[in-house]
């Protein structure tokens, strides 16, 4: 006999199965996270982040106006009262000039987000992280809790966060936002510290409203938290925010976060680990991590006083990228635009060099996994990755005799070896002592597809 109740039950159950399958296909299965680290740390990292491998960091704010020393200019000048910074201000600015007086000069006059996005795409970046707010407290979007200290009210009179996000997403580049939890000189933060952190005036009226606003307004794929180190996560209400982010926010299924959410959180809690600036482990970690570094070794923000001696060589960038990916990390490379929104030519040159290398060798980078052996050193340093049953061996220096020897791969009679960017198979032999000996192509100088870090692809190896 036909039963209406049974039929509706069957339809409802089928819809639930369909929704569950859909959620799993999109990344993460439905799960409720509680505001504590054991629960939050159990959340799987969305797959896109590990597959992306290479991102770009952009430090841009009012500190781009004095553009001297580093993006910590305000703190060094009026927090530490460094003699060098005090002297710089005395020699270049009139008496009574305040840090806030720099803001109108932060014009972003030549900021063309489409051009930036084109550059980032040409660099091979799969995600971009912009400083929405650094420790100075100036927000690069029209924050309601940062009156007259944001990019809409003063300076550019533009929503910098929104404009760049729209441009990069047109190119299928993931968009992340850096946000500093603390601010050096905010009166409410100083009051909370004076009260021994027994009050949370700053958190409730500034930090948390900003974070919720950023997520709801821009729906970032990544939140790069910083400025956490002076206070425990209980002061910042970090676990409550992350539980909301993972359970209820509009980006709950795809958002990725780092580990800077309070004292003692770094390298212990959160999504992936930064551990420290320019962190570089010596062996394969058991947790997903990211190395963040800067083209200008002495600063994250733009400096008028930078010199070529502080600019990282393109070969060094590529070597760091290769090493980082082989050890299971992501590589986040920083540049600092100037106050007018110009990415200076030397920074563009470095980014385009990375992009050129990735056009040839990206197969060994994007969506790869660490191999059972991460590196070896014989005639040259070799770093390994693997993907789709192939093994990739990237060697950093061309051997003088034109022969690369690999100790780790176990060859079979069906093994084939090619070089990315070159046609044809390479000749190889197996030696019981030296391992696999691979004869490299003999071509005139300047005719190789890349000038450093060449990648061998090995198929059908044990």
UniProtKB/Swiss-Prot annotation:
GO cellular component terms listed in the entry, alphabetical order: lysosome
Alphabetized Pfam families for the sequence: Alpha_L_fucos, Fucosidase_C
Organism: Rattus norvegicus (Rat)
Glycosylation sites: 237, 264, 378
First and last residue of the signal peptide: 1-28
Cystine pairings recorded for this chain: none
Presence of keyword Hydrolase: yes
Transmembrane segments: none
UniProt-listed GO biological process terms: fucose metabolic process; glycoside catabolic process; lipid metabolic process
GO molecular function, one term: carbohydrate binding
Record-stated family: Belongs to the glycosyl hydrolase 29 family.
Marked site positions, May be important for catalysis: 292
Superkingdom field: Eukaryota
Record localization: Lysosome
Entry EC no(s): 3.2.1.51
Reactions listed under catalytic activity: an alpha-L-fucoside + H2O = L-fucose + an alcohol; a neolactoside IV(2)-alpha-Fuc-nLc4Cer(d18:1(4E)) + H2O = a neolactoside nLc4Cer(d18:1(4E)) + L-fucose; a neolactoside IV(2)-alpha-Fuc-nLc4Cer(d18:0) + H2O = a neolactoside nLc4Cer(d18:0) + L-fucose
Keywords (A to Z) from UniProt: Glycoprotein, Glycosidase, Hydrolase, Lipid metabolism, Lysosome, Signal
Gene name linked to the record: Fuca1
Summary of the function given for this chain in its UniProt record: Alpha-L-fucosidase is responsible for hydrolyzing the alpha-1,6-linked fucose joined to the reducing-end N-acetylglucosamine of the carbohydrate moieties of glycoproteins.
Protein known as: Tissue alpha-L-fucosidase
Family annotation (PANTHER family): ALPHA-L-FUCOSIDASE, TISSUE ALPHA-L-FUCOSIDASE
Quaternary structure note: Homotetramer.
């Amino acid at each position: 006999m036909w039963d209406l109740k049974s039929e509706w039950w069957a339809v409802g159950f089928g819809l639930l199965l369909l929704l569950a399958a859909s959620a799993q296909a999109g990344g993460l299965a439905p799960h409720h996270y509680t505001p504590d680290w054991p629960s939050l740390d159990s959340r799987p990292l969305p797959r896109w982040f590990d597959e992306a491998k290479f991102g770009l960091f952009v430090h841009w704010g009012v500190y781009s106006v004095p553009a001297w020393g580093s993006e910590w200019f305000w703190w060094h000048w009026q927090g530490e009262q460094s003699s060098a910074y005090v002297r710089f201000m005395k020699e270049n600015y009139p008496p009574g000039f305040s840090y806030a007086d720099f803001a109108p000069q932060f014009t972003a006059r030549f900021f063309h987000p489409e051009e930036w996005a084109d550059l980032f795409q040409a660099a091979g970046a799969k995600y971009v992280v912009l400083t929405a707010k650094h420790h100075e407290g100036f927000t690069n979007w029209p924050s309601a809790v940062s009156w007259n200290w944001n990019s809409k009210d003063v300076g550019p009179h533009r929503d910098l966060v929104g404009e760049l996000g729209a441009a990069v997403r047109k190119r299928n580049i993931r968009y992340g936002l850096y946000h500093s939890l603390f601010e050096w000189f905010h009166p409410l933060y100083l009051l909370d510290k004076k009260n021994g952190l027994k009050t949370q005036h700053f958190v409730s009226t500034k930090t948390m409203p900003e974070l919720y606003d950023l997520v709801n307004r821009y729906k970032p794929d990544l939140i790069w938290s910083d400025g956490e180190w002076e206070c425990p996560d209980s002061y910042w209400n970090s676990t409550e925010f992350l539980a909301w982010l993972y359970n209820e926010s509009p980006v709950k299924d795809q958002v990725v976060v780092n580990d800077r959410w309070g004292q003692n959180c770094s390298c212990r809690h959160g999504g992936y680990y930064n551990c420290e600036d320019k962190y570089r482990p010596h062996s394969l970690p058991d947790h997903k991590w990211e190395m963040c570094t800067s083209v200008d070794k002495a600063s994250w923000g733009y400096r008028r006083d930078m010199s070529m001696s502080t600019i990282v060589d393109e070969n060094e960038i590529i070597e760091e990228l290769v090493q980082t990916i082989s050890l299971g990390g992501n590589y986040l490379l920083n540049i600092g635009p100037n106050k007018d929104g110009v990415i200076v030519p030397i920074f563009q040159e470095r980014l385009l060099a990375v992009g050129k290398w990735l056009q040839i060798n990206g197969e060994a980078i994007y969506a790869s996994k660490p191999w059972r052996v991460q590196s070896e050193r014989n005639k040259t340093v070799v770093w390994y990755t693997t993907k789709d049953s192939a093994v990739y061996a990237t060697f950093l220096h061309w051997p003088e005799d034109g022969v690369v020897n690999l100790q780790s791969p176990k060859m079979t009679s069906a093994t084939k070896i090619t070089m990315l960017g070159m046609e044809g198979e390479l000749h190889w032999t197996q030696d019981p002592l030296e391992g696999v000996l691979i004869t490299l192509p003999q071509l005139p100088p300047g005719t190789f597809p890349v000038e450093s870090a060449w990648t061998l692809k090995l198929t059908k190896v044990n």
